[in-house]
Design a protein with these regions (language model features):
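Bacterial Sec-dependent N-terminal signal peptides
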Residues: 1-26
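Extracellular/oxidizing-compartment recognition motifs
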Residues: 23-108, 112-506
């Protein structure tokens, strides 16, 4: 009996390996338009790619079959109602074009693939993957409007991009442009049924941060990408399915200027203003019962001035924490003092942002703290990088703090911004209620050093009772495309050369 039981146990352990051995190969790492489960696809003929894992060497694919369906249930049942390629004799596995029915705007599609080896043995079907279509025409936006806090000042519209002080002075004389207030928007809505999928299509110009029920949507930085805005603007697609809740929900959006509106203040490499910062959004909710609901931007949205009091892609960013309104991103907030959003009437061509977003890649701690001959405190982060800072401080009042980033130092150890453009600074006005933390949202700079004005490092003499800084950390922001390879060898010089090239590419 014991021997029989032992044999059964051995068979149970070994049997899966026999099953695995029967599979000559498998399909994995599926990609659509070179992304895993992408959103915002606009081409009517997306391309599919996959990789093959085989047990034998010199494997060669002899054929493939792709199924595409408009529901996972159909695909699971083997029904490719959008495309069934049939067994296609081909060794191709990279950028295989879709050749099925017309793809619809805003629709999510499901696909899988299998392949045959040169002995005509098929693999098992791959796991199911998805791709989501973007909004393909103006009508797909369901009458969403570009909304703003302020009207455009028509006599200040500059879309050609003025380079250099001489050109700016000649064209604008003493006129300041781009001095619009930075807005934040909110909209509440109700979800009353189980949600199958929810997708947001968002363009906030120059840049936006979006929040749902108080939580930031995505980890993107400086969305959307830069364009010639009177020719086209990019929108970004987000899957909100896991963030919506039954009952009341609230959307909040903050805008920065970016290249859409460059104020004629501080440093500017070029000057342009397409008008007041503005927002366009459509949220498409698909319910489990097959019904749908659209939430779109319009004059029923509420808006007010945000705590971001200055935003320039070239000159920096200021934030006044005393202007924060607790709970404004949450449902139930009292927004009766807010304004109705303005319909700008503006139009431009809209394209889906298909590149990987900028994100925070690394946190870079302070490695050295020193005082200049003039008495300013300087934080040395140990390496040059592009990005922003993370500031934490303790304050008993609202004394403003300025942080000057720079790549270089002057002979007297003060920061030198000549290599990157001056003047540039991050400004923060605390609430004055203890520990506070902040990081800029709509600008970036290349720097290693941070010089402080209006605060002192914690633990240092502070006879004037200034805010005390407990942390300055660098946040390295860069392109977030995944690494697909690396290099390392026994020669330190080659490794260092590779590292320099790598850092240059991702900055």
């Amino acid at each position: 009996m014991k021997n029989r039981l032992l044999n059964i146990c051995i068979l149970c352990m070994v049997f899966p390996f026999f099953l695995q051995a029967a599979d000559t190969h498998s399909v994995y790492n599926l990609r659509c338009e070179q992304e895993e489960n992408p959103l915002g696809i606009e081409t009517g003929q997306p391309c599919f790619s996959w990789q093959i894992q085989a047990q034998q060497r010199n494997f060669e694919q002899s054929a493939w079959q792709i199924l595409v369906a408009d529901s996972p249930e159909k695909l699971q049942a083997g029904n490719g109602n959008i495309w069934d390629s049939g067994k296609t004799l081909s060794s191709a596995s990279i950028l295989v074009p879709f050749k099925g029915k017309e793809l619809k705007a805003g629709q999510t599609y499901y696909w899988k693939v299998r392949s045959w080896d040169k002995e005509d043995s098929p693999s098992r079907w791959s796991c199911i993957h998805t791709f989501g279509m973007g909004l393909l025409s103006e009508k797909d936006w369901s009458n969403a409007k570009w909304i703003a806090l302020e009207k455009d000042r028509k006599d200040e519209i500059v879309t050609i991009g003025l380079h250099g002080l001489a050109n700016v002075d000649r064209e604008l004389k003493g006129k300041k442009i781009g001095m619009y207030r930075l807005p934040q928007f909110r909209k509440e809505f109700t979800v009353q049924k189980p949600v199958k999928r929810a997708t947001a299509y968002v363009s906030g110009l120059g840049h936006f941060d979006m929040f749902l029920n108080g939580e930031k949507v995505g980890n993107n930085f400086l969305d959307p990408g830069w364009t010639k805005y009177d020719k086209c603007a990019l929108y970004v697609t987000f899957d909100l399915s896991g963030q919506l809740k039954q009952g009341g929900n609230a959307i909040g959006v903050m805008l920065g200027n970016g290249f859409f509106n460059i104020p004629r203040e501080r440093y500017f490499k070029l000057l342009a203003s397409y008008g007041a910062p503005r927002l366009l959004m459509k949220i498409q909710i698909e319910y489990a019962d097959g019904s749908t609901q659209d939430i779109v931007t319009g004059t029923d949205w509420k808006t007010t001035e945000s705590p971001v009091t200055y935003s320039s892609i070239y000159g920096g960013e200021d934030y006044d924490a005393t202007k924060e309104q607790t709970g404004w991103m949450q449902p139930g907030f009292d927004d009766r003092t807010w304004n109705k959003a303005l319909d700008t009437g503006w139009k431009t061509r809209l394209l889906s942002q298909r590149s990987a977003p900028l994100t925070v890649r690394d946190r870079i701690p302070t490695v050295r703290l020193f005082k200049t001959r003039k008495g300013q405190w300087v934080y040395d982060l140990g390496q040059n990088f592009s990005g922003i800072i993370r500031l934490s401080l303790h304050s008993k009042d609202t004394h403003p703090v300025k942080l000057y980033p720079a790549e270089l130092l002057n002979p007297d150890s003060t920061v030198n911004q000549s290599a990157s453009g001056a003047p540039f600074w991050f400004g923060y006005t605390p609430k004055g209620k203890g520990i506070e933390s902040w990081q800029p949202q709509f600008t970036y700079y290349g720097f290693r050093y941070v010089q402080v004005e209006g605060a002192v490092p914690a633990g240092q003499p502070n006879p004037d009772g200034l805010p005390e800084i407990t942390e300055i950390t660098g946040l390295h922001t860069c392109y977030s495309a995944e690494d697909v390879g690396s290099f390392h060898c026994s020669k330190p010089l080659f490794n260092q050369t590779y590292e320099l090239i790598y850092l240059s590419l991702i900055h």
